[in-house]
Amino acid sequence: MTTRLSMEIQGVPYDNIEKTIAFLGEHGLMTGGTGAKVRPVVSCKGTTCQYGLIDTFALSKKIHERFYVGYHDVVLPHKFKIAVGGCPNNCVKPNLNDMGIIGQRIPKPDSEKCRGCKKCQIEKSCPVHVPKLVDGKLYIDPEECIHCGRCKGKCPFGAVPEY
């Protein structure tokens, strides 16, 4: 297995390469992903993870069909890597790829629903402690928020809705 979760077959004699490619194709396996081409798309487990915010499998499949399969015969200036991460935790390192997608949720507090609880569940749920009660109302600094989505649905009064 490679770091991009592909199989690498070593030791195939040069004169058997075409036969090997044909054999793999007959069994539903694609070859490629080497050289100056789009490499296989990688993704995290997405919504099956407790932190997953987007369906990485569905998105990766669309990207795979469009770019890996669709650009299979296109020679690029260099290898092109794509990764899809389901949240800002960065498990598959989308920001280190040529194209990276990171699932995010931007909270939009509803000040009408905030009751200024002394033990605010939104404050408690944030891993970077961004939400604060200011004058008895919830405030989330948009510049400091990491958009991890852990606050969604935590307020029993709906001050931060499920989006």
Annotate each language-model stretch with its function.
Residues 45-48, 67-72, 76-79, 100-153, ...:
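Ferredoxin-like iron-sulfur electron-transfer modules
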Residues 1-107, 113-116:
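Small-residue-enriched alpha-helical segments and adjacent helix-cap loops
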